[in-house]
């Protein structure tokens, strides 16, 4: 069973699993709406074995991010969350993609809050091509164009039958995976933070 909520400092979460220990999963981005629908099912499936012994919290970023908010600022929000909601840690953390950028700062600035750290699909700095695609994705999503946003990553695939097939599948299934953002400007703030990130 999954449960959605918001921590006292405004960070949204989705919780599932059983056990005395907790694991925080810093969700990717850009976008701070917690996963739902098919995307949530994909995450619960990916963490199924871990959730048999742990309570897994998928956390995003708080809503209403001001212009210029950085991945380091976001890591400070997570530090407050760990202190307030998880007895000051230490706690296991998995940073996925954009969440991995944030986890790097948390580990560097607050190592006492982390027991174990896994960084997946993230580097110390994003590649220029990827950052441009993320920005385009954020721009389209912030306009509510979910299908168009979903196809932005296809720019990395050469033209041909394979690309056309992927485009069709993405176009077909996007409504099951993505919804229009609650706070569109936050996508742009996060995409800009990703462009500035250099841990």
Where are each of the predicted segments found?
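Glycine-rich, phosphate-binding/catalytic loops in enzymes
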Residues: 40-44, 74-75, 134-136
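Conserved alpha/beta-hydrolase catalytic His-Asp/Glu region
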Residues: 128-130, 148-198
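Flexible "cap/lid" loop of the alpha/beta hydrolase fold
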Residues: 101-104, 108, 115-145
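Conserved alpha/beta-hydrolase "nucleophile elbow" surrounding the catalytic nucleophile
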Residues: 95-100
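Catalytic nucleophile-loop/oxyanion-hole region of alpha/beta-hydrolase
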Residues: 64-76
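Conserved HGGG/HGGXW glycine-rich cap/lid loop of the alpha/beta-hydrolase fold
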Residues: 5-66
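Conserved acidic catalytic loop of the alpha/beta-hydrolase fold
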Residues: 73-92
